[in-house]
Amino acid sequence: MLKILKYSFYDLMRSRWSYVYFLFYLLLGIVLLFLNNDLSKAVITLMNVIIILVPLIGTIFGVMYYYNSREFTELLLAQPIKRSSIFLGQYFGVATSLAMSLIIGLGLPFVFYGIFNSSAIWDFSLLLVTGAFLTFIFTALAFVIALSNENRIKGFGYAILLWLFMAVIYDGIFLMSLLYFEDYPLDKFSLVATMLNPVDLSRVLILLKLDISALLGYTGAVFQKFFGTNFGLILSSIMLVLWVVIPTFFIWRIAKKKDF
């Protein structure tokens, strides 16, 4: 699996799209720091970009890589190599290269700007960690969708629909539920609903770390009371890890049972 991981990693790192992805974040970091001298405000702006863009890129790259490397994958399947090793190696290779492009692309401008001497270092570190988690999560979900659909058009459609649901539609349903059932105690419902969506969970963790939970109103107070504690932070971290582990398990399971 490690050899396939390394091959997929270097293959994607040589791709021009990886350079475009890296340069986009590099330029974004430079422009934000040029226009804004406050590192905390720059981190907030980056959060709004990363929360939406990183899942989208992870989803698209994951689906594209699977379908574009299908012939090479079929060649590997003819070799005495475990199926799960092939697809897990490809997944980790793609996700790792995307996460590195994100971390290095955003990290370089902030390092040269002096982020290590700023109090915003922990906020920025959390931003990069959640960005890496979202990359691994949505790349895994993309591989699950691609493995489940031989039709390329269907695979792309389902992948984009998944991203749209997680990033936009889920929030709309969540807010409508809060408004419709406002006469009922919704503290536990809000916490559970947030943890069931990695995008919302990442956003809440960053907002609480930036100490701007007041922007979320009453819900923000509930989140601060729970996620602001050590137990809440540990539980949310476990949930993010589970969001990586569960789709990865499905990749292994589908690859093992799928008839190629």
Name each region found by the language model.
Residues 65-96:
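Helix-loop-helix units of permease transmembrane domains in multi-pass membrane transporters
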Residues 169-245, 249-253:
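Terminal transmembrane helical anchor/hairpin motif
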Residues 30-50, 93-158:
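Secretory targeting signals
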Residues 255-260:
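Short cytosolic juxtamembrane segments of multi-pass membrane proteins
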Residues 1-20:
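Aromatic- and glycine-rich beta-strand/loop motifs that create alpha-glucan
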Residues 22-26, 156-165:
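Central hydrophobic cores of alpha-helical transmembrane segments
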Residues 46-69, 91:
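Long, hydrophobic alpha-helical segments
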Residues 1-3, 38-46, 67-78, 100-109, ...:
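Hydrophobic alpha-helical transmembrane segments
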